[in-house]
Amino acid sequence: MSNTRHKIKAVILLSGGLDSTTTLAIAKTKNFECYSLSFDYGQKQKSELKSAENFAKIFGSIKHRVMKISLSNIDFSALTDDKIDIPKFSKSDDIPITYVPARNTIFLSYALSWSEVLDCQHIFIGVNTLDYSGYPDCREIYIKAFEVMANLATKQSIEGKKLTIHTPLIHLNKAQIIKKGLSLGIDYSLTTTCYQADKSGKACGICDACEYRKLGFIEAKVADPTRYQI
């Protein structure tokens, strides 16, 4: 008899990139019954959604939903606004133009809603605060604050079913994340990290996401399987 009914449900935010795919794999190793959630939010490149679909199947997600929402009308981020170019990588303490206003708050809110429908008290998100672009909604203090808010805002929390937001990568650098993922059998050539990957998923090689990814493989001392345009 299948033991899936005894597993604990979890909603996994899955973009199809290196971090979120590793997070899904970690959730599976912890024996969670995974429900993957991706977003078509008006991002310039859509190849990450194909990657998300592939990994949802590879890691046996019970369901994979792609929520179609529009953040492109905000006209602020280089990831969604056609009038703003994706910048080349640069080291800076400033929040970059690739920041999408309140994106993780929006994504987590959808995950929260779906988790309540599923009678699920666990959400996984692949944020980390090392080797990242400095987005404020990737910080641990933000995730903890959202968890507090969520446990004041839902029917299931009021009934005693408290939500936990899991951030298994929060204190890992890219090299550590890559090593962890490889130990779990992830084929990183199938992930899409680049902010402006082409339709086939080939990465630009010059944006922040590409540079952090390249550095991660170098520091992990393993071959980078990423297909780069340059």
UniProtKB/Swiss-Prot annotation:
Top-level taxon: Bacteria
Binding site for Zn(2+): 194, 204, 207, 210
Catalytic activity: 7-carboxy-7-deazaguanine + NH4(+) + ATP = 7-cyano-7-deazaguanine + ADP + phosphate + H2O + H(+)
Cofactor info, note text: Binds 1 zinc ion per subunit.
Cofactor names: Zn(2+)
Signal sequence range: none
Cross-referenced PANTHER family: 7-CYANO-7-DEAZAGUANINE SYNTHASE
The protein's name in its UniProt record: 7-cyano-7-deazaguanine synthase
Organism, as annotated: Ruthia magnifica subsp. Calyptogena magnifica
